């Protein structure tokens, strides 16, 4: 059993805490400028939707634009470093990329592996349910 030394006031003396965890510091790799034309949004015809998905605005790059509350913009655009790095996170990793979909992008088919996975999931859930019913009732006694 470990013993603790008691100081004059009845509390254990303070010692520096030693941690065995490593501190990991992320370092940016400087990947260069993102090419906005290769992210899968070229087939979108509506320019407003296309700019929204790319994280751009045709108005915010101008000095005289005003936001919804009436404050004057600074002319940096949506992403201040767009000219330097190419795109914001919306540009290099957009949520909706129809160019990268399959030929039948409007429909989703599971295929054989998907059906087997769903059947396995249903069987596992049924087995768990039957086990719970039997273990909590008089049927298991």
From Swiss-Prot:
Residues with PTM Phosphoserine: 43
Transit peptide: 1-27
InterPro entries found in the cross-reference section: PSII_PsbR (IPR006814)
Subcellular location: Plastid, Chloroplast thylakoid membrane
Membrane topology field: Single-pass membrane protein
Cellular component, GO annotation: chloroplast thylakoid membrane; photosystem II oxygen evolving complex
Keywords: Chloroplast, Membrane, Phosphoprotein, Photosynthesis, Photosystem II, Plastid, Thylakoid, Transit peptide, Transmembrane, Transmembrane helix
Modified residues (Phosphothreonine): 34, 37
A Pfam short name: PsbR
BP term (GO), one: photosynthesis
Transmembrane segments annotated in the record for this chain: 114-134
Domain of life according to the entry: Eukaryota
Function: Associated with the oxygen-evolving complex of photosystem II (PSII). Is required for the stable binding of LHCSR3 to PSII-LHCII supercomplexes and is essential for efficient energy-dependent quenching and the integrity of the PSII-LHCII-LHCSR3 supercomplex under continuous high light.
Similarity-based family: Belongs to the psbR family.
Protein name: Photosystem II protein PSBR, chloroplastic
Organism: Chlamydomonas reinhardtii
Gene (name only): PSBR
């Amino acid at each position: 059993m470990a013993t603790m030394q008691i100081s004059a006031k009845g509390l254990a003396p303070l010692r520096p805490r030693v941690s065995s965890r490593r501190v990991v510091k992320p370092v940016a790799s400087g990947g260069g400028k993102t090419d906005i034309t290769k992210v899968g949004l070229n087939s979108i015809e509506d320019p407003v939707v296309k700019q929204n998905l790319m994280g751009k605005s045709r108005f915010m790059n101008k000095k005289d634009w005003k936001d919804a509350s009436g404050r004057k913009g600074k002319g940096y655009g949506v992403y201040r470093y767009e000219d330097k790095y190419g795109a914001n996170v919306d540009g290099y990793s957009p949520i909706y990329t129809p160019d990268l979909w399959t030929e039948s992008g409007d429909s989703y088919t599971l295929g054989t592996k998907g059906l087997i996975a769903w059947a396995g999931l249903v069987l596992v859930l049924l087995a768990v349910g039957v086990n719970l019913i039997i273990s909590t009732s008089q049927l298991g006694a």
